Curated annotation (Swiss-Prot):
Cited InterPro entries: NA-bd_OB-fold, RNA-binding_domain_S1_IF1, S1_domain, TIF_IF1
CDD domains: S1_IF1
Protein name according to UniProt: Translation initiation factor IF-1
Name of a matching Pfam family: eIF-1a
Family: Belongs to the IF-1 family.
Keyword DNA-binding attributed: no
GO cellular component entries: cytosol
Recorded GO MF terms: ribosome binding; rRNA binding; translation initiation factor activity
Function description: One of the essential components for the initiation of protein synthesis. Stabilizes the binding of IF-2 and IF-3 on the 30S subunit to which N-formylmethionyl-tRNA(fMet) subsequently binds. Helps modulate mRNA selection, yielding the 30S pre-initiation complex (PIC). Upon addition of the 50S ribosomal subunit IF-1, IF-2 and IF-3 are released leaving the mature 70S translation initiation complex.
SMART domains: S1 (SM00316)
Species the sequence originates in: Pseudomonas aeruginosa (strain ATCC 15692 / DSM 22644 / CIP 104116 / JCM 14847 / LMG 12228 / 1C / PRS 101 / PAO1)
Protein's gene: infA
Record-annotated S1-like domain positions: 1-72
Places the protein is found: Cytoplasm
């Protein structure tokens, strides 16, 4: 899968799950389970409930995603 296949959406963190997984509500109302990208984990970027985030989704599984950016 290449990077062009994925697309990004904005959302809000609704719930924190174990193993750095988060439940994110997207702008369109859908709720997805997302994990932190490797660079965010490496740089110790903390994500809390209520944070605005950018989630990268693939067309293969729209219920899972990767958090690539946390808005301030």
């Amino acid at each position: 899968m290449s990077k062009e296949d994925s697309f990004e959406m904005e959302g809000t963190v609704v719930d924190t799950l174990p193993n750095t997984m988060f439940r994110v509500e997207l702008e369109n109302g859908h709720v997805v389970t997302a994990h932190i990208s490797g660079k965010m984990r490496k740089n110790y970027i903390r994500i809390l409930t209520g944070d605005k985030v950018r989630v990268e989704l693939t067309p293969y599984d729209l219920s899972k995603g990767r958090i690539t950016y946390r808005a301030r």
